[in-house]
Amino acid sequence: MPSYLVETYLARRCAGERAVRDERARSAAEELTRVRFEHSIHVPEDEMCFFVFDAPSRRDAALAARRAGLDPIRVVKALSSCTPITDNANGEEQR
């Protein structure tokens, strides 16, 4: 399943709020059967917080973010060195 990066604003002085947002993101994803919250990354210097969701579409990831009250700035498809790659020949996942 593709991963999506949800970009949000989180002030440097509010860094402690990230854990609360993580829990809201996790709960919102659990309400949507095809979405999974993976983790978040806070960049205090830039006052940005990124939430990673696995979802079948950008729309589903954005819906989870909105339900969590994350107020997304943008939602983009993301690739990671941890993202499984599917071998089309036999359908097995490889890293």
What is each of the regions a protein language model found here?
Residues 56-81:
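An amphipathic, aromatic/His-enriched active-site/gating alpha helix that lines ligand/cofactor pockets
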Residues 5-8, 38-64:
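Short, well-ordered beta-strand segments in beta-rich or mixed alpha/beta enzyme
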